[in-house]
Amino acid sequence: MTIAVGRAPAERGWFDVLDDWLKRDRFVFVGWSGLLLFPCAYLALGGWLTGTSFVTSWYTHGIASSYLEGGNFLTVAVSTPADAFGHSLMLLWGPEAQGNFVRWCQLGGLWNFVALHGAFGLIGFMLRQFEIARLVGVRPYNAIAFSGPIAVFVSVFLMYPLGQSSWFFAPSFGVAAIFRFLLFLQGFHNWTLNPFHMMGVAGILGGALLCAIHGATVENTLFEDSEQSNTFRAFEPTQAEETYSMVTANRFWSQIFGIAFSNKRWLHFFMLFVPVTGLWMSSIGIVGLALNLRAYDFVSQELRAAEDPEFETFYTKNILLNEGIRAWMAPQDQPHEKFVFPEEVLPRGNAL
């Protein structure tokens, strides 16, 4: 008689079967994150293409914003809902549209649709990077880096209008529409003088500079290890040896600046840290704007410029330009308010 010792194999449930199917090796990995990413990305992109192709902004902004109305790639947009709707989610079955799809598009419901599905799509893409990193066995710094763009999207398209009176003050989804929003931020918030904007610019441009320097330095110090027609053919993805000389690169920059990175890990962490921190700082600044927080106000210069016509600085010039943006942009940007500015309140002074 034979006695078998051991555990009976556990019965596989539907969760295990689904887990196997989602993580199967295929051309486009799905994964659990794909259940969020793919539907949301598809709906956000589809909503944007539909809106820019066919949907007018006449009822919300008093403008034409689609290819059907004669716009082009730079001028079409999916526009924000009207100011009167506040922070309504603008659901298709909500009290505004009452299930009428055409009316829902006319009232700006597509903007909420694209913004919310876009936000969840970006989050799904970050989760995808976490999931694949875990399966491959690498650290999740790609996902951490992608938190920067997510922070910017959420702060600009969701947090800022939530701090203002309605979704109307968020940027519409279009090229020229984003430019309008930038002018709005400058005129109403003096955004370029905000220290968080300065940190964001330093991070993005600093990251671009580091990327250019790093790429050029690596190309400069490639080992001449082949007789191939060009240096790129000499590289094998599985080769054990280095493909460029860190020692030579270190010596080069030591001669240029008197200082250089000697640790590859610190160098690449720095290249990650600079742009991502810049994006996060910009996001924090936008949340501050949502709450109408002021940045730098050099009141002493403004007072002196008001008293002395011969005194002005670049700061006082910019303040006057901001007043001009507010006075001339508000009637165009918010026609529903029916703003009328008398001649005497329009900005005058040395700058204009």
Curated annotation (Swiss-Prot):
Instruction: Report the GO molecular function annotations.
Output: chlorophyll binding; electron transporter, transferring electrons within the cyclic electron transport pathway of photosynthesis activity; iron ion binding; oxygen evolving activity
Describe its function: Photosystem II (PSII) is a light-driven water:plastoquinone oxidoreductase that uses light energy to abstract electrons from H(2)O, generating O(2) and a proton gradient subsequently used for ATP formation. It consists of a core antenna complex that captures photons, and an electron transfer chain that converts photonic excitation into a charge separation. The D1/D2 (PsbA/PsbD) reaction center heterodimer binds P680, the primary electron donor of PSII as well as several subsequent electron acceptors. D2 is needed for assembly of a stable PSII complex.
- Keyword Cell cycle found: no
Organism lineage string: Bacteria, Bacillati, Cyanobacteriota, Cyanophyceae, Synechococcales
To which species is this protein native? Synechococcus elongatus (strain ATCC 33912 / PCC 7942 / FACHB-805)
Task: Return the protein name.
Answer: Photosystem II D2 protein
Kindly give the membrane topology term recorded for this protein.
Answer: Multi-pass membrane protein
**Record's subcellular location:** Cellular thylakoid membrane
Q: Where are the transmembrane segments?
A: 40-60, 124-140, 152-165, 207-227, 278-294
Q: Which HAMAP family match?
A: PSII_PsbD_D2
